[in-house]
Amino acid sequence: MADSRDALLAFIVLGAGAVGTVVGGFWLAVYWMRSLGKKVGYSLAPLGFSRPRGGFLAGIGAGMSVGVGAVLLGMIVNPMSILVLERLGYSTESTIQQPFMEGLVGWVQESPGVAVPAIILVVVLFGPAVEELVFRGAIFNGLYRLGALVSTRSFGKDHGRSSTKTIFIASALASSVMFALLHLEPVLLPVLLILAITLCALFQRTGSLLPPFVAHATFNSVAAVLIILSGLKVLNIPI
């Protein structure tokens, strides 16, 4: 229980550091470019802090749809992952996520007034916000822009739609593999990889971090609700 609380606190500290690194690094790059005479501003819009194409409601709706779809996909893919791993002789025991979730359930049982809002704030809101900024706003976005720059310098502005697709696929795969591996759960690896690639596409299509954040928060909210309801003994289900 204490370990889970410590893990939440550590994630907040690391997340805040990651946000500071991304934003600070971006502003430092802007400052350097301005010193070279480039006309660039300090707006965080290039990182995805902007209005989604199609508007806020459309972006939120798209994000919720992707999040719900990911939850349903997980219900199908995760059992298949377990079956494949067991057939290959690998352990499917969760050594990180399940003990963490069980600790949070115990915390809810002990101090629901503190635990419930903390879980919602960190698992549903803060965590997805940090991860979307880092993996979609910074890593995927940075790789895609770098690939587009190299392609333009090499082949000119008319490098073609196929080249753009190749750059997207490479950037999405690289950032999504890092995202999936970060969670250290072999059973969840396929669904997390699919989710991450979809979030890259959602970010690319809308030009905003809001839709992928909503999708990520929707996906995480299912686990948060199960933890809270189990801790409050409303549901008696294995975590």
Give the residues covered by each predicted segment.
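Transmembrane helix-loop-helix hairpins at the membrane interface
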Residues: 106-239
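Alpha-helical transmembrane segments of polytopic integral membrane proteins
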Residues: 25-33, 74, 78, 127, ...
